[in-house]
Design a protein with these regions (language model features):
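Expand to "…catalyze enediolate/carbanion chemistry for C-C bond making/breaking, isomerization
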Residues: 2-530
Length: 530
């Protein structure tokens, strides 16, 4: 039975109010959600509509370039605000969902910072979202603990700096409406965390720090900045207290990195190279280009032309503006009981971080506590006792728009690559429908970006004349359906237990990858099912 709570006028909540939820869903916290919704929802909707219009132009053949109207910002001599002390050193950042055990292990991992996630590594059902807020409130106060399977989990004296990723602009919180409209998932996550924790964090010498996902333009960054200004005033903390690192994980945002930093310059803590979603974004934005087709996902590394151009431009842009540049995810995880495979995987992490550190990045992401020492070692080799290398200006890097659009490699596309996309897509979606958004699959820690790349590549290969396997077979809807049947059986064997979500996942994956239309985000229709 739901615990009774007092709601602001015009607000309705359909999610169950479990015992303890009333400490998060307080009248004052919900009033902040309602106020921010009323102030900014029309702009959010206008920006989402602008995405639709831009997509139509891209579908008609338009290609992005650096904006003529913001040339003065790109050429100006401005900097972002000085960083707070506990965001100066971010050599290794660990990421993971807002789940209690994960939070404790990540904060204790030895990483400099921990991005705790309401977004891609979290299945956003109501319980996960509100339990996540409870967990973070306890973590901020250092009271978080857990007794599980005979083990006791507590925080160490020294913990990582906490950074919170709310949901992106495109996602709603379906359980909460204001004046009959669903509220933004991002504003809901952000406002509840800020209200309950901003002053406590400041008192402990830190602050409310965020990661902002999935933005496609500097106008979307401007909206976040305006939300920050209004929210800081509402909760009574100084302007500029909030800091936000923006994930550059859409190809359109890569053309507006200076402008995004400029919009958030009072509140910026740099940019991050969100590599997996970036690849998905490229496929999505140029899906109708018959000449555009990428090879197997495993071949699209950070060293291929368009990814290398994006990584170097991000680095150069950040350091020019005195902002940290954080490298992307190493999704590899330690492999038990296979020393040879484990050595190879750890070698991959090492070379990944070595390249980032040598290029000039100030830190990078890992998905597992076991990778923290390896990543740390590579950054310390380059940084020594310096907290970052923002002073390393990359004036030698000259990137033009065409470099960001140099989509290679186109081959090989293999049966193994196609089957892997189908297998991983079904496996991840099934876990997501079952409430888990962070899933180890084939020795990689996968989140929603993986499923997005998988299904969008399959969709593209079916439609592109270049979607031909290296053995000469054309990728067709029929071939995908045939492989999907077999891969569903493989997934069911590997997961055991309740396989019903995986049956549903296979149907969704097949429908999305073989249908004529392209679904913008698979999490949008899926969210209605959880």
């Amino acid at each position: 039975m739901s615990t009774p709570i007092t709601l602001p006028q015009g607000m309705a909540i359909t999610g169950e109010i479990k015992p303890g939820y009333e400490a998060i869903l307080t009248p004052e916290a919900l009033a902040l959600v309602a106020a921010l919704h009323r102030a900014f929802e029309p702009r959010r909707q206008a920006l989402l509509q602008a995405r639709v219009e831009r997509t139509k132009r891209l579908d008609a053949g338009e290609r992005p370039d650096f904006l003529a109207e913001t040339k003065a910002i790109r050429e100006g001599d401005w900097k972002v605000a000085p960083l707070p002390a506990d965001l100066q050193c971010r050599r290794v950042e660990i990421t993971g969902p807002v789940e209690r055990k994960m939070i404790i292990n990540a904060l204790n991992s030895g990483a400099d910072s921990y991005m705790t996630d309401f977004e891609d590594s979290n299945a956003p059902n109501w319980t996960n979202q509100i339990d996540g807020q409870i967990n973070l409130k306890d973590a901020v106060r250092r009271t978080i603990s857990l007794e599980q399977n005979g083990k006791s989990y507590r925080l160490n004296d020294k913990v990582a700096t906490l950074i919170v990723r709310p949901r992106g602009w495109h996602l709603d919180e379906k359980h909460v409406t204001v004046d009959g409209q669903r509220v933004s998932g991002g504003i809901f996550d952000f406002a509840l965390f800020l209200f309950h924790n901003a002053k406590e964090l400041i008192a402990r010498g830190s602050g409310p720090y965020f990661y902002l996902p999935k933005m496609e333009s500097h106008l979307e960054a401007r909206l976040w900045n305006d939300v920050f200004v209004a929210a800081q005033e509402a909760v009574g903390v100084p302007r500029g207290t909030i800091r936000a690192t923006v994930l550059i994980e859409t190809i359109l945002a890569a053309f507006e990195m200076d402008e995004i930093l400029y919009e958030l310059r009072e509140h910026s803590s740099g940019l991050n190279a969100g590599r997996w979603d970036y690849i998905f974004s490229a496929i999505k934005k140029f899906k109708n280009d018959r000449d555009f087709c990428l090879a197997d996902r495993s071949k699209i590394t950070m060293t291929v032309p368009f990814m290398r151009a994006y990584a170097l431009l991000l680095l150069k842009t950040c350091h020019k503006r005195n902002a940290p540049a954080i490298g992307g995810m190493s999704a590899l995880i330690p492999i038990k009981n296979d020393p040879e495979a484990n050595d190879k995987a750890m070698g991959g992490v090492r070379s990944d971080k070595q390249r980032d550190a040598t290029d000039g990045y100030d830190g990078g992401w890992v998905a597992h506590p076991g990778l923290v020492p390896i990543a740390m070692e590579e950054f310390v080799k380059v940084l020594g006792d310096r907290p970052n290398q923002i002073e390393k200006q990359r004036d030698d890097v000259q990137i033009e728009g065409r470099n960001l659009l140099d989509f290679q490699p186109e081959a090989p596309i293999t049966e193994a690559g196609l089957r892997n996309n189908i297998n991983v897509g079904i496996h991840y979606l099934g876990a997501w429908l079952d409430g888990n958004g962070c899933v180890p699959i084939h020795n990689l820690m996968e989140d929603a970006a993986t499923a997005e790349i998988s299904r969008s590549q399959v969709w593209q290969w079916i439609r592109s004349p270049k979607g031909v396997l290296d053995d000469g077979r054309k990728v067709t809807a029929e071939l995908v359906r045939e492989f999907a049947k077999a891969e569903l059986e493989n997934v069911k064997r590997s997961v055991g237990g309740n396989t019903q979500p995986y049956e549903r996942a296979a149907a969704i994956f097949e429908q999305m990858s073989t249908s004529e239309g392209f679904t913008e985000f698979l999490t949008l229709p899926l969210y209605e099912e959880i």
